[in-house]
């Protein structure tokens, strides 16, 4: 039986270090279920999902984070978007053959990772780092080193649990109020956390996991937050996109297909617009202009 998708925040009482633990297997399953991705791409999306959930939980404001991988290999794009409510969605775009057991480099080729932080109120921030690490976690380490943010380490695990895909992970971060000497404590905790196995994350209760990892430490565990798949697509958003098309383009599609079928690449939902729908959209467009 799958454990509920949740994010757990915790704090080391004797160190200026905070932590997070997330399990997102059901959300991972939802992201994959409308697509037929090769196994290495499935794994990449699972890793991105865990990373995005953990990073989103570090936000001190309402907003969202998008973590995306782009490159010139067969996997042109892999992206996960999540918000402060831990609502996640994601997709990959593939153009070419992805061989079994492909590495990140073999899938993406020469590329980069973009992390975009978008507050509900405020300016957007975007960080870019070249994909030079062997794994996504390595690339995230590079990102934190280059962006001069608080020392942060992520530990990402994906796999199969009870015949279904599973994804989880942990994050450690030094607090802004950290005193001198915290770096040594942080490194010690990183070494302990690195021993976590996927099977432990997927099957054990959070308190047991923390006890196994940090049985000599005093850990404060906070109330969990639910993690879920949630797509933000809607018929209105599709209509807003159609408004940007010229009448000539719309008429051409109608003559050819009889309607316009718009499919969300995140969740697979189809939105059908016939001639009457499009006429109403045109009227709305004219009203907006006046």
Swiss-Prot record:
Localization: Cytoplasm
Domain of life: Bacteria
Keyword Flavoprotein: no
Post-translational modification: Under oxidizing conditions two disulfide bonds are formed involving the reactive cysteines. Under reducing conditions zinc is bound to the reactive cysteines and the protein is inactive.
GO cellular component: cytoplasm
GO molecular function: protein folding chaperone; unfolded protein binding
Example of a GO biological process term: protein refolding
Keywords in alphabetical order: Chaperone, Cytoplasm, Disulfide bond, Redox-active center, Zinc
Gene3D superfamilies the record matches: helix hairpin bin, Hsp33 domain, HSP33 redox switch-like
InterPro entries for the chain: Heat_shock_Hsp33, Heat_shock_Hsp33_C, Heat_shock_Hsp33_N, Hsp33_helix_hairpin_bin_dom_sf
UniProt record similarity statement: Belongs to the HSP33 family.
HAMAP family for the chain: HslO
Purpose: Redox regulated molecular chaperone. Protects both thermally unfolding and oxidatively damaged proteins from irreversible aggregation. Plays an important role in the bacterial defense system toward oxidative stress.
Name of the protein in question: 33 kDa chaperonin
Organism: Photorhabdus laumondii subsp. laumondii (strain DSM 15139 / CIP 105565 / TT01)
Lineage, uppermost ranks: Bacteria, Pseudomonadati, Pseudomonadota, Gammaproteobacteria, Enterobacterales
């Amino acid at each position: 039986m799958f454990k509920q998708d949740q994010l757990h925040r915790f704090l080391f009482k004797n160190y200026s270090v905070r932590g997070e633990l997330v399990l997102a297997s059901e959300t991972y399953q939802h992201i994959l279920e409308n697509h037929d991705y090769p196994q290495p791409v499935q794994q990449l999306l699972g890793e991105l999902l865990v990373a995005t959930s953990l990073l989103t939980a570090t936000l001190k404001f309402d907003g969202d984070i998008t973590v995306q991988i782009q490159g010139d290999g067969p996997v042109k794009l892999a992206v996960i978007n999540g918000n402060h409510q831990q609502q996640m969605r994601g997709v990959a775009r593939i153009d070419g053959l992805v061989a079994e057991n492909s590495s990140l480099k073999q899938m993406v080729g020469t590329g980069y990772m973009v992390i975009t932080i978008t507050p509900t109120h405020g300016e957007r921030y975007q960080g870019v780092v070249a994909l030079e690490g062997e794994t996504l976690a390595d690339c995230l380490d590079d990102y934190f080193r280059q962006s001069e943010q608080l020392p942060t380490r992520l530990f990402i695990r994906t796999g199969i649990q009870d015949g279904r895909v599973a994804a989880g992970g942990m994050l450690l971060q030094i607090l802004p109020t950290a005193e001198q000497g915290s770096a040594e404590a942080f490194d010690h905790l990183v070494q302990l956390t690195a021993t976590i196995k996927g099977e432990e994350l997927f099957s054990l209760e959070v308190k047991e996991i923390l006890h196994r990892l940090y049985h000599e430490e005093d850990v404060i565990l906070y109330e969990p937050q639910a993690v879920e798949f949630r797509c933000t697509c809607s018929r209105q958003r599709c209509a807003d996109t159609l408004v940007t098309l010229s009448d000539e383009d719309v008429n051409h599609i109608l003559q050819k297909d009889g309607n316009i079928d718009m499919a969300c690449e995140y969740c697979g939902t189809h939105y059908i617009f016939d001639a009457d729908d499009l006429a109403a959209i045109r009227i709305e467009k004219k009203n907006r202009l006046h």
